Amino acid sequence: MTSPAKSSTAASSSSQRSLSAWSPLGGERFYAAARWVLIILLGVVTQFLTNGGLWPVTDEIGPLEGIFWLYVGFALVFTVLAFLQFAAGLVSISYLFDIAFISLMTFFGGERIVIFFPLYLVPLTYAAIRQSRSVSLLSGLLAAVAYMAAFIAWRRLIAPEALMTLLDYVALALRGTTLAIVPWVTGNLAERQSEFNRERVTQAQRDAEQALSEARAYRDQMRSLYRVALTLGSTANYRQVLDTLLQESQKIVPYRAGIVLLSSGQPNELYVAFGSNLAPGDLNRSLKMDTGLAAALRANTAQVITSFTQFPSLQQLGSLRTCKAAALLPLQAGMRVYGLFVVATDQTLTTDQVEMLMALANYAIVALHNAQLIYDLKEEREKLLSHEEEVRHQLARDLHDGPAQAMAVITMKAEFIKRLLERDPAQALAELDELSSIAKRTNYEVRTMLFELRPLMLETQGLKVTLEQYLDRLRAKAGNTAIVLEGTDIDKVRLGSKVEGALFNMIQESVTNAIKHAKANHIWVRLRRLNDQMLEVVIQDDGVGFDKAAVLKSYERRGSFGLLNIDERARLVGGRAEIDSTPGKGTQITIFVPIES
């Protein structure tokens, strides 16, 4: 039993064979229909010329009527042949028979012979379209000769009494010339139009192929961007980020060399941190910042160059010496500049390629920024834990050196007074007075310590009043050092509770360090409202100062230094701190914190 699928396939094949058999005869079938229109016109003309003798058909029909009916029979036969594949060759020259029949009817048309002239245009137009230019020209000449011969033969053989004038000959020549050139002109016009149409079709195909190629390239680029986004979004390793950037850039722009320049840590210096297709010795090479590199790093968009003359630092790299063009893409996020991505090629870079490279670089910048934030967060966490541990140790030392020893003295004094009461009550009273003094002093020290840890009045009376009371307590410990508090336009300043507490701790640590280490005559604490968003606090002394670079190195070794922790704590509350110190010229610490709107 035949399956429906096989039956459908067989029917489709049969239909395709039928179409292939009919399709070559499309022009001939149309011309067969046009021939019947021509026959109708000839019938009307013949009926007019024979005064109604065309129909009904009798035994005494004239030659014009006979030729017409022969032509009708011819048309019937060739109409059938137009649908048969094997007769295609014969059908293609059937227009010659049309010319012959029209010429015979012209010969027998009598005085109205001119009326047959337009009917030649139907077969001649067919010849112009279906045949070559040379064949259509020969067909036109044949039709012209046949028409002129029929016209002259009728005048000479059938109507010799009708004399031809010069005007008749001129008119005949014009009609003959028209018949001769019409197919040639029509054929040329048709061929030129066909060539134009072919060119348009070819151009449309080229445009379609180009559009398809661009669509495929765009699809590949989107896939690359997706892969980059997926890879970069799942890693916090900046090395993997930059490796992915180099690999995916190679797919978009087959570059000669890809180079990532990062800061070396030295002023105005970069180094080759990563690269692809690098020349020997280029990796880790240090480059001084020239004018061109500085401008490229400051730019917000990619810079395309065709010469390295303005980039003497890049000329040192062997990887770039044979390259003709390069794209310089800054790797920056906000105010932070990570480095420069250089893509060097042997060919000119297109705008689309540069835009895609910039898109890849932007993905990499986001990943780099995230990696940096994660790194900074870990560093801040370690520093905060270290600072917390340091504060605990400091608190333990302060408690041990102050209240703990005082309590031990009080305990010993109390035991001594108990024994002394039995032997010398008067002396015991004196000892009780001293014990009371020690207890009061210890109570003051404990209160001061609690005040320094978290003054409750900070929440009720504000920063300035709290600082005034704190500095009053501190002046007793400061010896000959004068502590001056100044405030400018800060009465209505409101800070968040966390910001206010952090700022108090930063001021406290700065002043305490100045008292302990600066050996200063004066310490100034100045508060000033800069604008509606920022409060500035300056802690300045005229002490011995210190070498900031040396302290930084010491800080890196020890992992702890109070003054340098101030900037970290300021950034935690949305501010920043600046430390400026010179040996022999004192120290100035400037803290900026946000004002609560």
Curated annotation (Swiss-Prot):
Record's GO cellular component, any one? plasma membrane
Supply the enzyme class, top level.
transferase
Locate the transmembrane regions by residue number: 37-57, 67-87, 109-129, 134-154, 162-182
Entry's EC annotation: 2.7.13.-
Which keywords fit this entry according to its UniProt record? Answer: Cell membrane, Kinase, Membrane, Transferase, Transmembrane, Transmembrane helix, Two-component regulatory system
Cell compartment(s), UniProt: Cell membrane
Q: Name where it mostly resides.
A: membrane
- Recall the GO molecular function terms of this protein's record: phosphorelay sensor kinase activity; protein dimerization activity; protein kinase activity
The record's annotation in Pfam families points to: GAF_3, HATPase_c, HisKA_3
Name listed for the protein in its UniProt record:
Uncharacterized sensor-like histidine kinase Caur_0899
- Taxonomic lineage per UniProt? Bacteria, Bacillati, Chloroflexota, Chloroflexia, Chloroflexales
